[in-house]
Amino acid sequence: MNGDEGAEKITRILVAVDASPLSFAALEAAAELAASLHAELLGLYIEDINLLRAADSPFAREVGHFSGSIRDLDSQRLQRQLRSQAKRVRRRLSQLAERSHIRWSFRVTRGAIDAELLSAASDVDLVILGRAGWSGKRQLGSTAQAVASSAPAPTLLHAPRTASKPAILVVYDGSQVAQRALTTAANLILGQEGFLSVAIIAADHEEARRLQIEAAIWLRSRDLQARYRWLFEVDEEIVKKLMSVEGECTL
């Protein structure tokens, strides 16, 4: 890593929202971040094409959220629900943008969630996702994993704050995307007296040691320190455990 990477500026932030409480929390955090960075906030609501296709199946059923009753999954009712959710998201984004005095836009797309997110991420500097949503934790876990590994911009996985100081976990493997994620994390944590943890992804101890030295030297040049963990195999469950131990946000 070199000093030029530290000059990267976040001017456009994409936040994907599905009207769940945790995604609204991510929206609020994104608005705060956009205000502090004088960045534009882009809200994205995705109508899941797989869910809509399932609703067209004669065998599709849904369980009432409160009553627990089982009924046919009606595609027309589902589309009305999706439109209603999108309106709620847009209204909340408008309120937050007005309160935070930030530029914003909102878009509704229909398609596969991973593909739509990756497409929207192609022209932004940071992507923010809530930790849960889009039909539950399992769906978000695979979505976040796909976006984080393939998106050209760093992806921040947000959860509601549990401490007074921000905590960010960076997954670092030395790649260009990982370097951008470390740069973004450093920019977010500077001046906030927060906590930074770096999960080193490596094939062996020698590579892990080299990557830790590389990251530590770069962070020290910005008067930052971090806590390090070495991982030699990574799956979704390991990342989830790290998130629960290390901090509220993961890059």
Where does each model-flagged region fall?
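Gly/Ser-rich helix-loop-strand patches that form or flank binding pockets
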Residues: M1-G3, K9, P21-S23, L27-A29, ...
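Small/aliphatic-rich secondary-structure junction motif
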Residues: N2-D72, A163-F232, C249
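Short glycine/proline- and acidic residue-enriched helix-loop micro-motifs
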Residues: I70-R80
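Active-site beta->alpha loop and helix N-cap motifs at the rims of alpha/beta catalytic domains
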Residues: L78-Q85, V89, T109
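A short helix-to-beta-strand connector/capping loop
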Residues: A97-S105, R220-R227
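Short, flexible loop segments at the rims of nucleotide/cofactor-binding pockets, characterized by
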Residues: W104-R107, G133-G136, G174, Y228-F232
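Charged docking surfaces used in two-component/phosphorelay signaling
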Residues: V108-A115, L231-E237
